[in-house]
From Swiss-Prot:
Pfam families reported in the protein's UniProt record: TPR_12
Stretches for region Disordered: 153-197, 411-438
Keywords: Coiled coil, Cytoplasm, Cytoskeleton, Differentiation, Microtubule, Mitochondrion, Motor protein, Phosphoprotein, Repeat, Spermatogenesis, TPR repeat
Subunit-level organization: Oligomer composed of two heavy chains and two light chains. Associates with microtubulin in an ATP-dependent manner. Interacts with KIF5C. Interacts with ODF1. Interacts with LRGUK. Interacts with VDAC2.
UniProt free text on domains: The heptad repeat (HR) motif is sufficient for interaction with kinesin heavy (KHL) chains and ODF1. The TPR region is involved in mitochondrial binding.
UniProt modified residues of type Phosphoserine: S173, S466, S502
Designated name of the protein: Kinesin light chain 3
Ranges of biased composition (kind: Low complexity): 158-167
Modified-residue entries (Phosphothreonine), positions: T498
Entry function: Kinesin is a microtubule-associated force-producing protein that may play a role in organelle transport. Plays a role during spermiogenesis in the development of the sperm tail midpiece and in the normal function of spermatozoa. May play a role in the formation of the mitochondrial sheath formation in the developing spermatid midpiece.
Subcellular location, record wording: Cytoplasm, Cytoskeleton; Mitochondrion
Homology family: Belongs to the kinesin light chain family.
């Protein structure tokens, strides 16, 4: 038996399409009505049975039996309707469960699709990193071969240079950029130099011991001792002399150096700005100490890659030193070197060549063509030429350095000089060994770049090969120059390393 359910008030308008939720709700209402009707029919059946049991006449009995049959048929129809309604409700619940499962599966499919996209992206990133790692490994293997070759060349270096290379002094990791004022005055003998100058301002006697201790601790890497020592001394000075005092500026300068050695360039820069302000107020804007602080600030900005901000500071330091010390003073030449390096990192090569040329003329006028500073400046100028692809000019400078610079006498050569001459030669050997190592790297870069030019650079390659015989068979005595055949026919050649000589 089927049951047709119509919405209330829709009589005569035909059946109306109901939503699944409304259909289920009305079906439940029908079930409740049928259950009530079934209970009522059960009551009628009971009353009819009682009436039949007590009825006497035959005609009345037949009527009651007929009523009982009608009620029984109605009760069966009600039972059938209830069964169909229960089936409909169960079917609705099942359909609802299937729909929920369908939605869950759709959601899971969307999530899996998104995860698949993520996994694909992760796989691509992993493959990219793998390729980069393989390229890095190949580059490192090539660099390792170059370093092994250069290590084999070191056995031909003079003994004095070898000993120095085994125990090099501790330097700043970015000292290849350019030295600050204090770096040039600081060394193993600093503890014994009681009147050492720091940035053009003489360290007071009461601060010299503290300064030497801080330099010693910083040189040993014991910054946990050096920094509190500086801060305690700074607090004592500020309590006794006030903040705006030259001694406070000096201590700020020392603490800035310690921070710089720890690569804490921002903290060091803030301290130097404070020291600069104090020195300008107490010593005047054109004092050499102000110029030194400006130079140190320029160095820190340069090491942080902020060359545009460093250049005006370096330019102002140069102007002060020219006015106070004269245009031909060695400190002016040092400042010109620093300014040239800053310009080089900004691509201002015309200014670079002009500054180096002026510094070179100052060094040659003061110390002659054999002054180590002359070779150092020429080496820097050659590096600038390399950056401009001026290989011929760079080659000529390297040749000039190699031909003009004296080298230490080889092991076993007769010693005819006095003790003072030997000490001077030792100091000169130490300086030249550093210059020689710098020239070695520059010539490697020159050879590497010329090789990269292919056939067009074949002529330049022949010129460059005359530079790849550094440190071979030193002359018998100091002052002897390299003969030209020695540069052209030496069996040892430098590796075409990709190491960049230029400052970073």
């Amino acid at each position: 038996m089927s049951v047709q359910v119509a919405a209330p008030g829709s009589a005569g308008l035909g059946p109306e399409r109901l939503s699944p939720e409304e259909l289920v709700r009305q079906t439940r209402q029908v079930v409740q009505g049928l259950e009530a009707l079934r209970a009522e029919h059960h009551g009628l059946v009971g009353h009819l049975a009682e009436a039949l049991a007590g009825q006497g006449p035959v005609t009345g009995l037949e009527m009651l039996e007929e009523k009982q049959q009608v009620v029984s048929h109605s009760l069966e129809a009600i039972e059938l309707g209830l069964g169909e309604a229960q089936v409909l409700l169960a079917l609705s619940a099942h359909v609802g469960a299937l729909e929920a499962e369908k939605q869950r599966l759709r959601s899971q499919a969307r999530r899996l699709a998104q995860e698949n996209v993520w996994l694909r992206e992760e796989l691509e990133e992993t493959q990219r990193r793998l390729r980069a790692s393989e390229e890095a490994v190949a580059q490192l293997e090539e660099e390792k071969r170059h370093l092994e070759f250069l290590g084999q060349l070191r056995q031909y270096d003079p003994p004095a240079e070898s000993q120095q290379s085994e125990s090099p002094p501790r330097r700043d990791s970015l000292a290849s950029l350019f030295p600050s004022e204090e770096e040039e005055r600081k060394g193993p003998e600093a503890a014994g130099a009681a009147a050492a100058q720091q940035g053009g301002y003489e360290i007071p006697a009461r601060l010299r011991t503290l300064h030497n201790l801080v330099i010693q601790y910083a040189g040993q890497g014991r910054y946990e001792v050096a920094v509190p020592l500086c801060r305690q001394a700074l607090e004592d000075l500020e309590r006794s002399s006030g903040h705006c005092h030259p001694d406070v500026a000096t201590m700020l300068n020392i603490l800035a150096l310690v921070y710089r050695d720890q690569n804490k360039y921002k903290e060091a820069t803030d301290l130097l700005h404070d020291a600069l302000q104090i020195r300008e107020q107490t010593l005047g804007p054109e004092h050499p100490a102000v110029a030194a602080t400006l130079n140190n600030l320029a160095v820190l900005y340069g090491k942080r890659g902020r060359y545009r901000e460093a250049e005006p500071l370096c330019q102002r330091a140069l102007e002060i030193r020219e006015k106070v010390l004269g245009a031909d003073h060695p400190d002016v030449a040092k400042q010109l070197n620093n300014l040239a390096l800053l310009c080089q990192n900004q691509g201002k090569f015309e200014d670079v060549e002009r500054h180096y040329a002026r510094a070179l003329s100052i060094y040659e006028a003061l110390g002659g063509p054999h002054d180590p500073n002359v070779a150092k400046t020429k080496n820097n100028l050659a590096s600038a030429y390399l950056k401009q692809n001026k290989y011929q000019q760079a080659e000529e400078l390297y040749k000039e350095i190699l031909h003009k610079e004296d080298l230490p006498a080889p092991l076993g050569a007769p010693n005819t000089g006095t003790a003072g001459d030997a000490e001077q030669a030792l100091r000169r050997s130490s300086s030249l060994s550093k210059i020689r190592e710098s020239i070695r790297r520059g010539s490697e870069k020159l050879v590497s770049r010329l090789r990269g030019e292919g056939a067009a650079g074949a002529a330049g390659m022949k010129r460059a090969m005359s530079l790849n015989t550094l440190n071979v068979d030193a002359p018998r005595a100091l002052g002897t120059q390299f003969p030209s055949w020695h540069l052209d026919k030496a069996p040892r050649t430098l590796s075409a390393s990709t190491h960049d000589l230029s400052p970073h």
